[in-house]
C-alpha cells in the first residue's frame, strides 16, 4: 500500500501552486482551517536548508539535470525532463490530498526574459496537463489578480505578500532560514476565493 495516499481525504481542499523552475511553492488549504501544509520543490538544497525543520513546511529536492554545454535539441529535451521531475513531485502532493480544486499562478509575461518565460510557460502547461489527466479542476490566476485579491494591490512587492501572509498564518512568523516568497504566493492562491 502506498503510504503517501490519504485514504480519508478532507471534505474541502484547495491547493495553491506558484510554479517555478528553481522553487515551486505549494500551499494546501484543508477545510479553510488555521493550519496549512506547505511544500517547496527546489532544484538544490543548501546545507542550511537541508537541516531546516518546520511542522508545516516540507522542502523537496527534485532531480535537476544540467543543460550547460549542451546543443539546442539536447538542452530542450533535458529541460522537458526537469519539468517532468517537478510535475512528478506535484502529482505526489495531489495524490496525497485529493484537492477539490487547484489554483495555479499564471505566467507573468512582463517580468522575465523570453527564454525564462518560455520555460515557465512550459512548466505551467505540464502542470495543467497532469491535473487534466487526474480530472482535478483547476483555475489559472494572474499574478496581478492574486496580489490584488490578497493585499488589495495588484503591484504588491514580495515583502508585502510575505507580511500579509504572516498576518494570516502566525505559525510561519519565525521562518527566516529559507526563501518563502513562493509560499506566500501559493498561500494567497489557496485562499483566493475567500477574499
Where in this protein do the model-derived segments appear?
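Phosphate- and other anionic-substrate recognition elements at nucleic-acid/protein interfaces
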Residues: 1-195
Amino acid at each position: 500500500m502506498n503510504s503517501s495516499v490519504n485514504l480519508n481525504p478532507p471534505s474541502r481542499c484547495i491547493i495553491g501552486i506558484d510554479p517555478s523552475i528553481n522553487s515551486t511553492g505549494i500551499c494546501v488549504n484543508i477545510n479553510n482551517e488555521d493550519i496549512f501544509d506547505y511544500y517547496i520543490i527546489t532544484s538544490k538544497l543548501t546545507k542550511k536548508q537541508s537541516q531546516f525543520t518546520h511542522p508545516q513546511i516540507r522542502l523537496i529536492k527534485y532531480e535537476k539535470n544540467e543543460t550547460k554545454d549542451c546543443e539546442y535539441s539536447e538542452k530542450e529535451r533535458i529541460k522537458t525532463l526537469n519539468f517532468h521531475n517537478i510535475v512528478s513531485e506535484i502529482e505526489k502532493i495531489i495524490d496525497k490530498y485529493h484537492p477539490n480544486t487547484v489554483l495555479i499562478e499564471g505566467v507573468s509575461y512582463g517580468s522575465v526574459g523570453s527564454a525564462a518565460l518560455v520555460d515557465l510557460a512550459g512548466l505551467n502547461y505540464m502542470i495543467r496537463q497532469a491535473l487534466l489527466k487526474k480530472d482535478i479542476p483547476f483555475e489559472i490566476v494572474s499574478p496581478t489578480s492574486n496580489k490584488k485579491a490578497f493585499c488589495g494591490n495588484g503591484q504588491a512587492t514580495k515583502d508585502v505578500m510575505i507580511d500579509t501572509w504572516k498576518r494570516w498564518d502566525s505559525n510561519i512568523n519565525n521562518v527566516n532560514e529559507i526563501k518563502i516568497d513562493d509560499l506566500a504566493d501559493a498561500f494567497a492562491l489557496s485562499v483566493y476565493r475567500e477574499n
